């Protein structure tokens, strides 16, 4: 039965490890807009026949509201098949499979990555961690039992950029968790600076990833792009024009270094519609940067299904 459950779970993961409305415990207080058409099963580059058989056992629906304009297919881009060994490890599940999600306040708030974590635990087993209650006030580290299953750690810092985590102590902390997969979610705060420079941003990503690779040589990586944000004072707020460049730089880095990327920014509408889509569904908080619980639930749902 556990083996079958793993196949079912893999099909769910194969549809976004990365950004959430499938289970009753995740329902928002306010109704989420109607869902659009079902997605075709996501093809993971290099998937085994055994993995694909499992994917056919479950139907996964697109959780983007049908009225989200200029949205793209919710997939992880991984032409080099860099995540295939990780997905195989999920399928085998002979011990704990450890995921460390690092990022800015979107990760620090815990809601979006927590939904991803709970869904993965549902699909692959929660026996690897002790039951816990996670809120904004608690830490986001899971506590292992030693049993097989998903171990999902959340390490977010308010205002963080990739430079924030390019620190020996933070790298040591991440390495001490023995990650199989590291999810890297930055870009919002880099793009918020008026002095943003694309080339400097790429160099900063490279420094962080270089440190992580050296400290965690067995880990695989998934980069994500930011969801979009506004800048300026409340009554004169405009869509941040630098986010499109920041998202492009993250995606370029991933492609150049044969890493997987989940391009949330363009999936939810990109330059023309990402912020407008979030806004018309009242998913932004008043600051135009952070999101309501509904907004983070949707991101978490997307993240889980893209995987």
Model features per residue range: what roles?
Residues 79-86, 108, 112, 116, ...:
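Stable alpha-helical elements in mature extracytoplasmic
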Residues 38, 42-47, 52-56, 60-69:
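Eukaryotic extended interaction platforms
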Residues 98-101, 106-203, 207, 214:
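Conserved SGNH/GDSL esterase-like catalytic core that processes O-acyl groups on lipids
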Residues 31, 63, 71-75, 79, ...:
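Coil residues (strongly favoring Ser/Thr
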Residues 165, 180-182, 191-255, 274, ...:
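Catalytic cores of extracellular degradative/oxidative enzymes
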């Amino acid at each position: 039965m556990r083996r079958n459950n793993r196949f079912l779970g893999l099909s769910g993961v194969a549809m976004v490890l990365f950004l959430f409305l499938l289970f009753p415990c995740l329902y928002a207080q306010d109704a989420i807009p109607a869902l659009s058409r079902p997605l075709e099963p996501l093809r993971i580059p290099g998937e085994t026949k055994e993995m694909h058989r499992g994917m056919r056992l479950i139907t996964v629906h697109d959780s983007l509201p049908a009225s989200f304009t200029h949205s793209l297919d919710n997939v992880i881009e991984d032409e080099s098949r860099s995540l295939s060994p990780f997905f195989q490890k999920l399928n085998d599940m002979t011990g704990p499979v450890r995921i460390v999600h690092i990022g800015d306040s979107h990760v620090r708030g815990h809601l979006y990555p927590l939904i991803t974590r709970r869904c993965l635990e549902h699909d692959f087993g929660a026996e690897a961690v002790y039951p816990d209650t996670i809120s904004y006030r608690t830490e986001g580290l899971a506590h292992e039992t030693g049993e097989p299953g998903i171990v999902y750690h959340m390490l977010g810092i308010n205002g963080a950029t990739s430079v924030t985590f390019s620190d020996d102590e933070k790298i040591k902390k991440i390495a001490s968790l023995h990650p199989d997969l590291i999810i890297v979610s930055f870009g919002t705060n880099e793009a918020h600076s008026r002095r943003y420079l694309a080339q400097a941003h790429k160099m900063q990503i490279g420094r962080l990833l270089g440190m992580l690779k050296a400290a965690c040589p067995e880990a695989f990586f998934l980069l994500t792009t930011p969801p979009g944000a506004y800048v300026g004072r409340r009554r004169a707020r405009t869509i941040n024009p630098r986010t499109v460049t920041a998202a492009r730089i993250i995606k370029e880095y991933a492609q150049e270094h044969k890493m997987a990327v989940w391009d949330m920014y363009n999936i939810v509408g990109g330059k023309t519609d990402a912020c407008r889509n979030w806004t018309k569904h009242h998913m932004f908080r008043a600051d135009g940067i952070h999101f309501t619980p509904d907004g983070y639930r949707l991101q978490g749902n997307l993240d889980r299904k893209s995987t």
